[in-house]
Amino acid sequence: MAPFLASPIRLHPCPLLFSHPHLFGSDYFAFSVKGRGAHLESMRVENKRGNRSWGTDAKRTHPNSIFNQLVRYGYIGTGFPDMNCSLTWSLIGGPSTLSLPSFFPSAHLLLSLALFFFLCIQSNHRMSKSGCERCRGRGFWDTDDQDTYFFKVMIGGFRRQMTIPYKFAENFRDQIQGTIKLKARNGNTCSVLVDKCSNKLVLTKGWAEFANSHDIKMGDFLVFRYTGNSQFEVKIFDPSGCVKAASHNAVNIGQHAQNMQGDPIEILSCSDEHLRAQSLTTERQNQPEKDVIDNCNKKMKTEHASSSEDDQETPTAEVHRMKVEEMVRAIHSNHPVFVAVMKKSNVTRQPCYVAISRKYANEYFPGGDQMLTLQRHGKRWQVKFCISKRKLRMLSKGWRKFTRDNELQHWAPLALFITLFFSPHFRKMKKCGQKMRKLNTRSTARDDQEKYFFKVMIGDFHKRMTIPDKFARHFKGVISKTIKLEPRSGYTFDVQVTKKLNILVLGSGWESFVNAHDLNMGDFLVFKYNGDFLLQVLIFDPSGCEKSTSCSMENAIDHVGQGWKEHNDISTSYHDQPKGNKHWMQKDSSSKGNKIGNTRSSNTPSKFSGCILPRGTCLPVVQEKKMKEKIQAIHSKTPMYGNVMTKCNVSGSPCVLEITQLYDDAYLPFNNGQELMLRHRDKSWKVRFYRFKNKSRKLTQASSLYKMRRPGARCREGHAHFNGNHIDGQYKNFFKVMIGRFRERMIIPNEFLQYFRGKIPRTIKLQLRDGCTYDVQVTKNLGKISLQSGWKAFVTAHDLQMGDFLVFSYDGISKLKVLIFGPSGCEKVHSRSTLKNATHCGEKWEEPLHISSNSHDLPVKSPQNVSKSEKQWDSSEQENDTANIEEVALQGDDLQGHPVLNCILPKHTRLTDMQKQQLESKVGAIHSEIPIYGCILRKSRVHGKSQTVDICREYADVYLPFKELNMTLQRHGKNWEVLCRTKDTRTKRLSTGWSRFAQENNLQVGDICLFELLKKKEYSMNVHIIPKK
């Protein structure tokens, strides 16, 4: 609706200034329209920044045709008064104002005011009108809808610029460009310029500083949320899906110089006059950056006047001030920056050094002489910081190499006055009461009580072991000089911690731990930090199974069960004793008198629910549990006596076994020297019982038959097998390294299968630390048990990569608890997004299946009708599919009359000796990790109208878990698309496309087709043919 005036009135040119709700940031535009009557002379739209303008000569043109172009861009409403006018108005972001000449007549003033407010009301009315589909569709930039998101993945040249998605960019006006603010999670903001390039909105100037300050890398994931007022909130995620920890360099860019409170800038050189110069005052708290630079300039002028001939080559203070100002703005550091102007003496004098002011050195290098690391362009140099006899703080040893590698030549003008910045690795602690940034708790998924890392024993692991840097951060700079290592045996070892080149190293005491547990090259150790500087250790051998330490501990510990200090009454129950781990003090093998002595125990005979132990006996959890089971199985009315075998009991001279006086007085009414009979496993031995003057009771003579010799290699293997199968009925451990084709399946070590005691369910649950579980089916192929169906979904959900380490812990009830470690040795933390593919544990478990020695090379996975997209099995179907693996294997023998290694044939297949020999030779030449499916072609498969090939259910359920899919058959470099679908009998049938494959490859009746499933290509098969003739 166009405004209307009763009679034509001539208006003097005057600016009408009013706000416009569509403007972006500080951009504003000017629209100039001049003309008389129904014709306009010209119209021009100009960006007041001068970087964009457009106009048109509108002679003999009706004003509505001109203003319709403005309407098209949404800046004004439709129509314009048909009158003689000459108006100029500007759209800005400020308040509505009106400016008129002072000599303007009152009548004209009233008419101008009426016209102005009418246009404002028309524009605002049309913008707020709910029926404006154009406005609602475009989602204008500064509308009330502020919760607008988009994300970007950092790929390609993301460091230079970033393009805003096209759909989101529709919120910008086509002609609007300006500056937006990016706000990170730590509250720091950065101003970034938005430019239009090839009809795309691009973040250019300021984006590189934002990316560098927040350490954004390739593959990072950024989520942008528009909060209004041209400001975005940015959340940064790393490739693992976790929120990225805020970088120490993430400061408020653009206001860095103003916000650095109390951070001085030191500008010094190596001349004696400069060494006596004082550092800049720290009264920079409320001083703007320009004043700081001016102070630097004044100081440089003073130094310049008093310098030597070398210093006379110094450029003007103004040039130096500009360089310093530019570099200060370019560096974004939370630490004070030290500036040193390079002189001729800094690069040519012998010895070559650069001096650092005393105030700066005392505050940020308080440790005296130390080695520092200088970084430039990704390279590092070790430089020594020292204090000379003249109390000068300087960088000396290694500085000359730094100058040479960076080509700092004194004759080059740029090299003479290069300004170097040193940002120390120490953070200046703020005084109490100042506002301090809160720690980023989200970046730490759990508290410090349960942190894991692993180490592989390689190199000179016998002498020392380094702790990963990422794990060392959990100590938060506070580390004890001694840390405790606690293996599964329950004994603790004190190991000293030293720091070498900023790396934590386990030194003194580590060698004793290695010898006690017989650690060898390739062993795999998992450490769990439980607080109070205690590391629990799991030890694995190269096979991936947990290593038994009982035998090796026997060699390292001289006395077990002796030297106990605490004393309790015999009537005291064992369970009333304070629980604690046995603690051993070690000395390195290099020191004399190397012994591992017991320093902590309880020390009176104790009653163990029907068993009396000697004073001070403290058993590990494993032995305690086994002892309880043994006592309950015996059902003795008389309390039993138990003792822990020590060195003197099995190898002493004489070899004796001591019995406590209290037990003797109550239950051994024998005469001194009386013979007793000991029985074990249907054998008997005679021993003699003695009472000595020191009131000790001992069994001697024949007890030497019980002598336990130091185990050899064969004995150790037997002990390892026995202890591994009998210690602690739950939580057996093994590990796997993700190498090769780990995404398809994972093989369980044969040594670990003994813990299942011959029984394993068809489905095993994998449980992560966050509590979510994944159902993975178990198959048997080529004599190996592997996790297959469902394993790929687990790998994908947790983004397992080549080189990752997985530690599995079996709880005894068909559940494997999993810890995931990255190649760095530290535990990987995953986002909550992995929960969507997980199924929580149920209360019911499947009946276990018996693994018989009769099972051969056939897959034993339970048949399931699942589609390709299905990643979890329905629990009700699983309960109905449990069967005996031995029965399946026997069926396999019936199905496959002539079994061939790594090849599955359909039921009732009969091969001649020649065919079997050819088949074994062909299968062996293929070297396929996945079993090959073979079939003999009958007439219906190569002749007739409906030529098809059936794949047996046993193979299809395991390796072709889909209902219908187009598969690719390959032979001699050619490809054929063949439809594979599921029949009612749950077998797979190759139908559409098979006849063409058979004709082009000239297949004949009696030929043997071998289908090799390829791993690199999804559901592609390489076909091998053995001709009949």
UniProtKB/Swiss-Prot annotation:
<feature type="DNA-binding region" description="TF-B3 4">
    <location>
        <begin position="731"/>
        <end position="824"/>
    </location>
</feature>
<dbReference type="InterPro" id="IPR015300">
    <property type="entry name" value="DNA-bd_pseudobarrel_sf"/>
</dbReference>
<protein>
    <recommendedName>
        <fullName>Putative B3 domain-containing protein Os03g0621600</fullName>
    </recommendedName>
</protein>
<feature type="DNA-binding region" description="TF-B3 2">
    <location>
        <begin position="339"/>
        <end position="430"/>
    </location>
</feature>
<feature type="region of interest" description="Disordered">
    <location>
        <begin position="852"/>
        <end position="882"/>
    </location>
</feature>
<feature type="compositionally biased region" description="Polar residues">
    <location>
        <begin position="852"/>
        <end position="867"/>
    </location>
</feature>
<feature type="region of interest" description="Disordered">
    <location>
        <begin position="572"/>
        <end position="605"/>
    </location>
</feature>
<keyword id="KW-0677">Repeat</keyword>
<feature type="DNA-binding region" description="TF-B3 3">
    <location>
        <begin position="450"/>
        <end position="543"/>
    </location>
</feature>
<keyword id="KW-0539">Nucleus</keyword>
<feature type="DNA-binding region" description="TF-B3 1">
    <location>
        <begin position="147"/>
        <end position="240"/>
    </location>
</feature>
<dbReference type="InterPro" id="IPR003340">
    <property type="entry name" value="B3_DNA-bd"/>
</dbReference>
<keyword id="KW-0238">DNA-binding</keyword>
<dbReference type="GO" id="GO:0005634">
    <property type="term" value="C:nucleus"/>
</dbReference>
<keyword id="KW-0805">Transcription regulation</keyword>
<dbReference type="InterPro" id="IPR044837">
    <property type="entry name" value="REM16-like"/>
</dbReference>
<keyword id="KW-0804">Transcription</keyword>
<dbReference type="Pfam" id="PF02362">
    <property type="entry name" value="B3"/>
</dbReference>
<feature type="DNA-binding region" description="TF-B3 5">
    <location>
        <begin position="934"/>
        <end position="1029"/>
    </location>
</feature>
<dbReference type="GO" id="GO:0003677">
    <property type="term" value="F:DNA binding"/>
</dbReference>
<feature type="compositionally biased region" description="Polar residues">
    <location>
        <begin position="591"/>
        <end position="605"/>
    </location>
</feature>
